[in-house]
Amino acid sequence: MKFLEAILAALAVTGALARPQRTRTGEVEAALAKLGVEVTKIPQLSGPMNNGCQNACGSLSELYGSEKVIAENTPAYHNVTQSYWAAQQGEVRPSCIFVPSIEKEVSVLVLISQLTDCPFATKSGGHAAFPGASSSQGGITMLFRNLNEVTLNENKYAASIGPGNNWGQVYKALEPHGLAVVGGRLSSIGVGGLTTGGGISYYSNLYGWASDNVESFEVVSAETGDILTASETQHPDLYWALRGGGNNVGLVTKFNLYTIPSTLLRGTTRVFSADQSSKVLDAFFQVARNAHVDGNAQQYVIFGRTAGANMISAELTYTKDVSNPAIFEKYRSIPAISDTTSTRTLLEYCDGIGTSDRNGLRELFWNRSFKLNEDFANWAVEYFYSIAPRMDSVPGAMSGLVFQVITEPMLEKMSHAGGNALGLDASSGPIHLMHILSMWNSTSDDDTIYGFANDFFTTVTAEAKSRGLDNEFIYMNYASQFQDVISSYGAANKARLKEIAHKYDPRGVYQTLQPGYFKLTHAPVANPY
């Protein structure tokens, strides 16, 4: 299979990547000593390094015991590997799983990884759709679940949030205070990946993306293990890079997010027959073009196919408890098969959306962005439905073409506090963010699904270019393993990210020993399709 061959090639390349030089051993040992770890007293670190990851796992177990270092072939290990959203991630087998409970222990892992040449990955929510994104084959998977604080500062204008939280935990902790933060739209999504990748929220037309609502990050230095604060005034270049740059410049152990008032949301999943697509798109574009008029409205539309049938689902959310807001009037005029309109808290809303988002299936995300154009959008929907029957023979296959808009208010807020790494601004938009999501049962059908998504976007991108509507931006949180996300931020931003990464991590620890997810120079896996 093409996909399996590509994964094996990627693993081979990962193994061949230049590691941080062993001449740093003395510096790393000194950094560990500052953290209370005496290398000479740990047999796995002071003796021969015959198997780097066995040495690393053994040394962590020596330091922290079996409660924090989960060994292979144990029930606890199985529970973790089966907790990923996508089955592809659950198939990855790390040498051990490390569960730190304080920031210092994260620093120790980063330093021990350098001594032993053992790669690692980190799991916040584990909601990526491909192997290695937050799991490390043969390396160490660091599970952040115990770094789960949610505390308010004295004036309650910011909340300190650990990367082990999912958004449901965050909203549950803040709602009794009448507060929320700009975060994910499903309760099960992890704080870490969503925020460093951008982070679209129900509140994004009002406040911007999650990454643009971070007061500061607390970040592990690969050089020393020190915890650095990255904010508009402290290490502002690092702060810029973490707002969209993913895991390339440091491990974040705490997100300090600005709080917002927690409101009741009025929302619905409104389902339409596929023959209403042009009317649905007319409503979609009307809401998108009026985001600056009423920022309380948020929407996405899924043009779906399952069990050989086409359908349309519009998720329409209003961040006030207002019946029939005027901005959604065109949607209400279209006959619906079903409508779930109700008033809920943010937590209830995110819990409800997540009920259909079950773990353990094979998953795909793949996205691209375009200039907002209604004729092109209608063409893309017609094209999707014309080729979607290719997947009807795949057991359990469900696929959707998802439409969202990066609105003008969102783009305007991306310049806040020095801007972010995404390469977008108000002159870019509004931008039509288009992605395919798919789920299915068996590895034997991987090539069919991946090939379908690749072919769709190859054709759609060519059509967009012929119309002068292409926009190269790829959203990290919806990208496939075959996409080079960082290059889509533009040459200048890519160069700046590389410069900042070299400044804070000159030996490339976060590029080579943390090889998973979207790196500065390449896609996770070469596209075989």
Where are these regions (language model features)?
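Soluble FAD-dependent oxygen oxidases
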Residues: 2-3, 8, 15-529
